[in-house]
Structure formats: C-alpha cells, structure tokens
C-alpha cells in the first residue's frame, strides 16, 4: 500500500471516515454516506471476512495519517516492542509525528497540507528548522511557524479558524505568536478516532 495522492474526499467515502478531519469533507460524507462509483450504494450486502475487516482497519489508520505500508508497519513493530498497551503506544507514536502535531496545532488545515508545510521548511522545533514530516516530537518541544512564513495566506486563514476551534488537550497553543508546545502524550480517550486498533494488532499478528 503506497501513499494515496488522489482526492481525499473520494478516499474518505471509500473508507467510510473523514480522513481529512475537516468540516468540508464531513459535510460531503453526510450528503453521500456511501463509497464512490456506480456500485457504491450497494456495498456492504455481503458479510466481509475477518481478514478483510482487519485489513480495512489498518488501511484506514495508515491513510488517516498519510503513511505508506513500510513506514506504518515499522512504527507498529516499534510500538509492539516496548512496554505498555500496544494499540495506545502505536497511536501515541503516530500522534508524535511532526506533520501531525502541526495539524493538531492548527498551523495546517489537513495532515496532507501539514506534510507539505513541514517539507518546505516552514516549521521550527525548539527554534531550529526541521523539514522531516516523520520527525518525532518529544514532550515539552516547542513547535513554531518560521517568521518569514507567518504572512502566507493559508497560514493566516488557518490561525484565524483555529481561534474558533477547541485545541487538542495534549498541546498548548499561542495563536498570536504562531507557536505551541507538545505538553503530554495523548491518552486513548483523548483521541476521537473511528478506529479499532485491536483489529490492526490482530492483522499484523496473523
């Protein structure tokens, strides 16, 4: 499974969840709550196999975070090798990706936009430029927008929109100064993800 580069709305309809986590995509899903294509509304009549259910769950989570199979599996194997609840540790590792933290802080409206924003060198971690989307953020790290990038139109729009939204409880945000702090690891109950991570554990344990 490579990284999907097509329409995030179509992919969200196929997977049955809002992969962009935006109001625009959610409205579209509410209007058309079935898979794309001429047979989309007829999907789901047959009972899917246990394997297909687990595969679909794995694909949903990987696509939610915009990751390819190799990178996704390597991260899962790391989570499985350390103490703790594997599913929760895995989700925490996903949440610590720099592109995801940039998205959670509202500097970008989607993870895809956040990945591009980081890759183009617009983000600083503790005052130093980091252009690797998969960079792992640590508790206490300060994430900020490069000063020369703060006047970009979409950054201004995102920050204005963020003022009206609830900030994820594991990050602290200073909207006026275009910076935030990754203050703690999210607990499983913090993450309103429509995912059953136990299916993913079972998929990789088969």
From Swiss-Prot:
Name of the featured protein: Small ribosomal subunit protein uS4
GO CC annotations, alphabetized: small ribosomal subunit
Xref: PROSITE patterns: RIBOSOMAL_S4, S4
Keyword Cytoplasm found: no
Gene: rpsD
Xref: SMART domains: Ribosomal_S4 (SM01390), S4 (SM00363)
One Pfam family per UniProt: Ribosomal_S4
UniProt keyword annotations, A-Z: Ribonucleoprotein, Ribosomal protein, RNA-binding, rRNA-binding
Species annotation: Deinococcus deserti (strain DSM 17065 / CIP 109153 / LMG 22923 / VCD115)
Domain S4 RNA-binding: 96-171
Region Disordered, residue ranges: 29-52
Function according to Swiss-Prot or TrEMBL: One of the primary rRNA binding proteins, it binds directly to 16S rRNA where it nucleates assembly of the body of the 30S subunit. With S5 and S12 plays an important role in translational accuracy.
Assembly with partners or alone: Part of the 30S ribosomal subunit. Contacts protein S5. The interaction surface between S4 and S5 is involved in control of translational fidelity.
Any single GO BP term: ribosomal small subunit biogenesis
MF terms (GO), sorted A to Z: rRNA binding; structural constituent of ribosome
Keyword match RNA-binding: yes
Family per record: Belongs to the universal ribosomal protein uS4 family.
UniProt xrefs under InterPro entries: Ribosomal_uS4, Ribosomal_uS4_bac-type, Ribosomal_uS4_CS, Ribosomal_uS4_N, S4_RNA-bd, S4_RNA-bd_sf
């Amino acid at each position: 499974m490579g990284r999907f580069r097509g329409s995030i709305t179509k992919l969200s309809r196929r997977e049955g969840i809002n992969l962009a986590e935006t109001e625009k995509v959610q409205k579209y899903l509410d209007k058309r709550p079935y898979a794309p294509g001429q047979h989309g509304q007829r999907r789901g009549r047959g009972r899917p196999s246990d394997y297909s259910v687990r595969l679909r769950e794995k694909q949903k989570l990987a696509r939610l975070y915009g990751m390819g199979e190799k990178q996704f599996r390597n991260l899962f194997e790391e989570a499985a090798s350390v103490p703790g609840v594997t599913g929760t540790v895995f989700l925490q590792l996903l949440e610590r990706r720099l592109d995801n933290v940039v998205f959670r802080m509202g500097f970008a409206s989607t993870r895809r936009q956040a990945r591009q924003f980081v890759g183009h060198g617009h983000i600083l971690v503790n005052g130093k430029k980091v252009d690797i989307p998969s960079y792992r953020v640590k508790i206490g790290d300060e994430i900020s927008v490069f000063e020369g990038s703060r006047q970009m139109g979409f950054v201004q729009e995102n920050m204005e929109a963020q003022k009206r939204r609830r900030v994820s409880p594991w990050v602290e945000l200073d909207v006026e100064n275009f910076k935030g702090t990754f203050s703690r690891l999210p607990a499983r109950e913090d993450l309103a993800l429509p995912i059953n991570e136990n299916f993913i554990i079972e998929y990789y344990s088969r």
